[in-house]
Amino acid sequence: MATVSIPANTTALLLDIEGTTTPITFVKDILFPYIKDHLEEHLSAHWEEDECKQDVHLLKKQVEEDLRLNRACAQHALDQSGHTDEEKAIREVVDNVLWQMASDRKTTALKQLQGHMWRAAYAAGRIKGEVYQDVVPSIRRWRRQGLKVYIYSSGSVEAQKLLFGYSVEGDVLDLFDGHFDTNIGAKVESKSYERIAERMGCLSEEIMFLTDITREAKAAEDAGVNVAVVVRPGNMELTEEERSHYNLITTFSQLEVMGRV
C-alpha cells in the first residue's frame, strides 16, 4: 500500500490497541485463556485478601443488577461469607466469570478482576504485551517530529499500561502522552472523540485516529477527526466501499507527516 499523509495541522495521534498496535490474537489467544486457566487458582490463593474480596463484591453487585433488570444470568448467588463453604463459593465465582466471558460481557466487575490477574501475570513474567514490530520505531519517529501519541482502547487504562509497560519491546510507556478507555465514552460514539479532543486541549481536526474497526473510524470522522484504517492479519475484512472510502495502512511506517522531517 502507498504512503498515507498525516495532515500538516496534526498535533496528536490516537491509537487503538487490538488489531492496530497489537495482534488481534493476543487478547483472544493469550489474555483471555490466562484468566480461564488460572482463575480458580487465583481466587483460592487470594480469597481472604481485601482486593479479592472487593472483586467478588463487585461481581455480586453485578448479579443483583442483572436480576433487577431481568437480564439473563447464569449465577444468581455469589456467597463469600461462609469459610466452610469457601470451595463452593469460589466455584460460583468461577462459573459466573466464565459465563460473562463466554457472553462477551464488558462489565466493570469482570474487567476489574481480569485486570488484577493480568497485573500479577505481567509482573511475574508469565505474560508479555505483544506489539507489531513497526509500532515502537514509528512512534519514536512521530515524537521526534513533534507529535503527541495517545492510546484509546476498550480495555481499561490499567490494562493498557500493563501491556506497554511489560511489552516484548520492554517498558515503552514513556512513548505515550496519555491513555483513554470507555470511561470517556464508547468508541463507536462521536461524542467520545470530542471529549478526547477537549481533554487533549486541541481541536478534533488536529487528531489522527488509527483503528482497524470502521464503525470506530466513522464515529471519529463524524467528530471531525482524521482517520486511517489499519489492515493487519486476522482483522475484520473490509467491504469494497470501506476500502475506497478510508485511507488504509498495513504498517505504521506508511504514515508520513506532511511538511516535517
Swiss-Prot record:
Subcellular location: Cytoplasm; Nucleus
Pathway(s) per entry: Amino-acid biosynthesis; L-methionine biosynthesis via salvage pathway; L-methionine from S-methyl-5-thio-alpha-D-ribose 1-phosphate: step 3/6; Amino-acid biosynthesis; L-methionine biosynthesis via salvage pathway; L-methionine from S-methyl-5-thio-alpha-D-ribose 1-phosphate: step 4/6
GO MF assignments: acireductone synthase activity; magnesium ion binding
Binding site for substrate: S153, S154, K187
Keywords: Amino-acid biosynthesis, Cytoplasm, Hydrolase, Magnesium, Metal-binding, Methionine biosynthesis, Nucleus
GO annotations of cellular component type: cytoplasm; nucleus
InterPro entries per record: Enolase-ppase_E1, ENOPH1_eukaryotes, HAD-like_sf, HAD-SF_hydro_IA, HAD_sf
Protein source organism: Salmo salar
Family to which this protein belongs: Belongs to the HAD-like hydrolase superfamily. MasA/MtnC family.
Protein name from the UniProt record: Enolase-phosphatase E1
Residues bound to Mg(2+): D16, E18, D212
Cofactor requirement: Mg(2+)
Cofactor annotation remark: Binds 1 Mg(2+) ion per subunit.
